[in-house]
C-alpha cells in the first residue's frame, strides 16, 4: 500500500464555498449558477491547466513526484478500482489499425507458418505483425492513442465482459472528472509546447524583419488558444457570431427549444446493473440523451413536424443541474404566423379524458415549481421573487408583444381552463395554467420529458438568445475556508461536473449547426497573419500565404459577379492549396453551366472601428462586387483613392456632415 504525502502533513480542515451572487462583470450570469444537486465535480482554476503536484510517500519514507500521465497514476490514485495495479494511460500506447486489427498477431503466435519478412525488417528494431490470412508482414503501428481514446475505451460496455469500473458509483464519477482533467491537460500541454515555437505576425512585418537582419526572435507574438479548442473564448465568440449570420440571412429564428434529459427513460433503466439507479450511471444518461437528441433533430428536420427547416443550431449544457439539456434554435422556410402559435405551442393543462398520456407528461414535467408562497427555497427565487416570472397572468388569447416575449393563452378554470393537484413539500397545492411552462404537445408526447418550446417573436430578443445558446462552459466563483470559516479571497474557475466529463470523454458534440458558416479573412494588403518559427521564417517571408481574401481576388469570371460574403455558396475553400474551388454538387445555377449553389454562408470577420483602414476595407468588401486587387477596391469611377475611407465616401457608404456645415452658412 501507499500513503499520499498530504496525509503526513498536519493541516486544518478546509471546505470550498461556491457563490452564485458574485459574477464577474461582462460574464453571463447563468454560467455562475450555484449547483442545485449533490454531484461530483472539479473546479479548474485559470485559463491553462498546469501540471498537478502529485507527491507519494514511498516505503523508505522518501517523497516522489508522479505525473498524472504516469502509467501507474490510475492504480495509485484509485486502488479500489485497479486493485491489481494495472497500467493506466501513458504517452507510448500504440494505436492498432481498426480495419486490420482482427487479422493481426505477433509472429511468435504462429511459428509453424512464419510470415515473409525482408532483410530490412529483420535489421530494424520494429516489432513485426502478420496478417493471419495472407501471412504477409505488417509493421507495428506508429500512431499513438490519445488520453480521450484510452478512457473512452475503458468506459465502454462490452457483451460478455464485466467492466467493474461501472459499479463504483461516486468513485466512478470522481474517476471520470479526474481523467477528463487529464485529457484537457494533455491537449493544453500540446498547444502550449507548440506555441513556444510557433509565432504569428502580419506578413509585411515579417518580411521587413527578414530583409533587415534576418533575426526573427523579436518578431511576432505567441499564439493563443485556437478557435478549434472547444469552449475557448474564440470558439464561443465564433459560434455566437455564426448564429447572428443566420439572423442576417434568414431573419429571426422561429422556435427556441430546450430539451432536457429524463433519467426515467426506459433506455436508461434497461441498461442499469443490479441495484443501480440512474444517479450511479452518468455514462448511460449521456449516451441515451445523445441518441434522444439525435432523434429529436431528425423529428424536426426529416419529418418536418413544423414545416421545412432552413437552418438550425444547438448547444448542450449542464448549468450545475446534473442532467444535460440542449438549447435549440430553429429557422423555418415558412415563418410561423401569430395565428398559428396556439396550434404549435400550448401553456395549458391538457384534458385528461381526451389525451391521458399528454396530461401525465405535462403535469409531471412542465409545471414550474410551484415557487413563491409555496416554496421560498426554490432555485428560481431571487430577492423573494421568481426569476422566471411565475406565476403568469391568465389570458383568454395569445398576445404577441413587441418585447420579444409572447404571452401565451392561459385560460382560467371559469373559462374552460383546468387545474391539477400536486404535492409541494408534503402539502397538496392546486396548480392552474398560470404555472405551466410553454410546450409543444407533439414533442412532449413523443419524448416524455421536459421540452420547453418558445416562439421567437421579435428581433429584440434574438441577440440575447444567440448569446444564451453560445454562452460557454459552466463557471464558478468560489472561496476556500478554514476551520474558522475565514475566506482569504475569491477565485474564478471552470466547473466540470461528472455528467459533463462523461459527455466530453465520449467525444459527443457540444455544439452543432447547419448550414456551415465559412469564416472569411479581412486584412490590408500584405497584412495577412503569418505563422512561423525560426526554421521556416525566411521561407514564409519569401512566399506570402494565401487567404480567403487574396484567393477571392484571383477566382474565375463567375466569382466576379459575387460579393465576398456570397462566395462560399458556390465555392469551397481548399485548406491545403489555399484556394477557392467550384462546388461539384448542389443546385445548378441557371445560365452558368458547371456552377452549383449550396446553403453555406460566409461571414467576414468583424473589425473594430479603431482599426480604421481595415474597417473601411471590410465595408467595401460588403458592398463592392468582384475586386481583382486591393488597388481596385480603392478605385471609384476611375479615380484611385489614397485611402479606403475616401473610397467609401465616394461610394456614399459613410454619412457626411458637410451638408450640415453648408446649411449653417445660409443666412
Whereabouts are the PLM-identified features?
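Extended, structured polyanion-binding interfaces
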Residues: 1-667
Amino acid at each position: 500500500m501507499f500513503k499520499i504525502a498530504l496525509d503526513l502533513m498536519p493541516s486544518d480542515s478546509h471546505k470550498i464555498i461556491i457563490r452564485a451572487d458574485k459574477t464577474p462583470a461582462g460574464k453571463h450570469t447563468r454560467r455562475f449558477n450555484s449547483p442545485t444537486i449533490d454531484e461530483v465535480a472539479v473546479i479548474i482554476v485559470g485559463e491553462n491547466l498546469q501540471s498537478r503536484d502529485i507527491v507519494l510517500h514511498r516505503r523508505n519514507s522518501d517523497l516522489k513526484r508522479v505525473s498524472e500521465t504516469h502509467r501507474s497514476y490510475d492504480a495509485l490514485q484509485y486502488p479500489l478500482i485497479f486493485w491489481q495495479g494495472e497500467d493506466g494511460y501513458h504517452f507510448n500506447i500504440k494505436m492498432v489499425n481498426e480495419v486490420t486489427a482482427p487479422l493481426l498477431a505477433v509472429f511468435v503466435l504462429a511459428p509453424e507458418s512464419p510470415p515473409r519478412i525482408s532483410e530490412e525488417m529483420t535489421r530494424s528494431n520494429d516489432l513485426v505483425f502478420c496478417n493471419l490470412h495472407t501471412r504477409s508482414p505488417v509493421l507495428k503501428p506508429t500512431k499513438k492513442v490519445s488520453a480521450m481514446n484510452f478512457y473512452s475505451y475503458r468506459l465502454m460496455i462490452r457483451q460478455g465482459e464485466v467492466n467493474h469500473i461501472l459499479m463504483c458509483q461516486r468513485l466512478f464519477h470522481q474517476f471520470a472528472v479526474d481523467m477528463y482533467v487529464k485529457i484537457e491537460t494533455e491537449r493544453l500541454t500540446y498547444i502550449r509546447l507548440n506555441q513556444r515555437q510557433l509565432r504569428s505576425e502580419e506578413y509585411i512585418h515579417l518580411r521587413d524583419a527578414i530583409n533587415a537582419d534576418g533575426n526573427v526572435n523579436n518578431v511576432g507574438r505567441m499564439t493563443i488558444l485556437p478557435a478549434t479548442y472547444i469552449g475557448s473564448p474564440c470558439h464561443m465568440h465564433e459560434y455566437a457570431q455564426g448564429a447572428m449570420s443566420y439572423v442576417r440571412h434568414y431573419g429571426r429564428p422561429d422556435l427556441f427549444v430546450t430539451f432536457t434529459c429524463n433519467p426515467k427513460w426506459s433506455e436508461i433503466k434497461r441498461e442499469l446493473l443490479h441495484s443501480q439507479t440512474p444517479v450511479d450511471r452518468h455514462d448511460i444518461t449521456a449516451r441515451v440523451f445523445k441518441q434522444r437528441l439525435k432523434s429529436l433533430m431528425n423529428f424536426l428536420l426529416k419529418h418536418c413536424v413544423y414545416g421545412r427547416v432552413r437552418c438550425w443550431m444547438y448547444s448542450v449544457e449542464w448549468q450545475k443541474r446534473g442532467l444535460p439539456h440542449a438549447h435549440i434554435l430553429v429557422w423555418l422556410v415558412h415563418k410561423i404566423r401569430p395565428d398559428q402559435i396556439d396550434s404549435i405551442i400550448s401553456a395549458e393543462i391538457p384534458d385528461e379524458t381526451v389525451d391521458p398520456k399528454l396530461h401525465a407528461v405535462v403535469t409531471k414535467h412542465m409545471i414550474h415549481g410551484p415557487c413563491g408562497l409555496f416554496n421560498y427555497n426554490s432555485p428560481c427565487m431571487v430577492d423573494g421573487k421568481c426569476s422566471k416570472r411565475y406565476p403568469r397572468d391568465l389570458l383568454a388569447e395569445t398576445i404577441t408583444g413587441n418585447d420579444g416575449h409572447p404571452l401565451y393563452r392561459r385560460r382560467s378554470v371559469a373559462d374552460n381552463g383546468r387545474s391539477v393537484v400536486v404535492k409541494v413539500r408534503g402539502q397538496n397545492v392546486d396548480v392552474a395554467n398560470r404555472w405551466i411552462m410553454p410546450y409543444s404537445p407533439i414533442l412532449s408526447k413523443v419524448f416524455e420529458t421536459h421540452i420547453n418550446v418558445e416562439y421567437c417573436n421579435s428581433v429584440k430578443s434574438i441577440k440575447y438568445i444567440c448569446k444564451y445558446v453560445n454562452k460557454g462552459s459552466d463557471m464558478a466563483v468560489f472561496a476556500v475556508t478554514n476551520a474558522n470559516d475565514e475566506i482569504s479571497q475569491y477565485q474564478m474557475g471552470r466547473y466540470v461536473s461528472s455528467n459533463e466529463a462523461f459527455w466530453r470523454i465520449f467525444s459527443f458534440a457540444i455544439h452543432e449547426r447547419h448550414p456551415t458558416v465559412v469564416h472569411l479573412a479581412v486584412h490590408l494588403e500584405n497584412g495577412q497573419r503569418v505563422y512561423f518559427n525560426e526554421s521556416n521564417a525566411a521561407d514564409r517571408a519569401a512566399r506570402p500565404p494565401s487567404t480567403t481574401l487574396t484567393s477571392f481576388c484571383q477566382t474565375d469570371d463567375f466569382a466576379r459577379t459575387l460579393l465576398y460574403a456570397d462566395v462560399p455558396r458556390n465555392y469551397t475553400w481548399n485548406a491545403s492549396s489555399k484556394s477557392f474551388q467550384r462546388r461539384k454538387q448542389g443546385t445548378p445555377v441557371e445560365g452558368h453551366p458547371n456552377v452549383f449553389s449550396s446553403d453555406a454562408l460566409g461571414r467576414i470577420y468583424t473589425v473594430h472601428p479603431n482599426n480604421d483602414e481595415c474597417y473601411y476595407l471590410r465595408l467595401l468588401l460588403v458592398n463592392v462586387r468582384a475586386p481583382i486587387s486591393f488597388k481596385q477596391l480603392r478605385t471609384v469611377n476611375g479615380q484611385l483613392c489614397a485611402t479606403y475611407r475616401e473610397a467609401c465616401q465616394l461610394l456614399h457608404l459613410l454619412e457626411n456632415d458637410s451638408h450640415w456645415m453648408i446649411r449653417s452658412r445660409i443666412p
